[in-house]
Design a protein with these regions (language model features):
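A short beta-sheet element
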Residues: 29-91, 100-104, 108-112
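Non-catalytic DNA-recognition/assembly elements of restriction-modification systems
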Residues: 1-12, 17-28
Length: 162
């Protein structure tokens, strides 16, 4: 993997973010997009790997211009490697084996940088990426529907016992 990506870090802390949600650039944290601000740190598609805490090893995909809280490393594909394909390939990596630390778990790029990633020709990559993106989109829709149904259930149960 180390020959496919450049590893960057961020020093941005959550308490430094003034979030009025009117900014045009996303800020990624451990739970996804946490704010919108008026400036950005990165302007290339990247894979974000959470490096600290109970969710260490969680993978996110960031595109466009964005910023990242310092709890993640930013893996930027080099030499025009396909970021979205690398994101999907990295989802198959078991990062638990790289966690260290007893109190707050950490993972380090130096430990998982030797992971091998299958990188087929462009036609195959595009086909794989298209299929997985379709499933990812469908999954997001299903999660939103489930959330809406859970809210409806809670409302109906509350209405029954007033």
């Amino acid at each position: 993997m180390s020959d496919l990506v450049i590893c960057k870090t961020s020093t941005l802390q959550e308490n430094e973010i003034v979030n009025d949600n009117n900014g045009q650039y996303k800020v990624f944290g451990a739970s996804g997009i946490i704010a919108s601000i008026d400036n950005y740190q990165f302007d290339k598609d990247a894979i974000l790997v959470l490096k600290d805490g109970s969710k260490a090893g969680k993978i996110q995909y960031a595109s466009g211009k964005f910023s990242v809280v310092g709890t993640s490393v930013i893996l930027i594909p080099q030499n025009e490697f396909d970021a979205k394909y690398l994101y999907f390939a990295m989802l198959a990596i078991d990062f638990c084996q790289y966690k260290v630390g007893s109190g707050i778990p950490h993972i380090y790029f130096k430990d998982y940088s030797s992971e091998k990633i299958y990188y087929p020709n462009e036609t195959q990559r595009n086909r794989i990426e298209k299929v997985l993106t379709t499933y990812e989109t469908k999954l997001a829709v299903e999660k939103r529907m489930l959330s809406a149904l859970q809210k409806q259930k809670a409302f109906l149960l509350q209405s029954m016992f007033i």
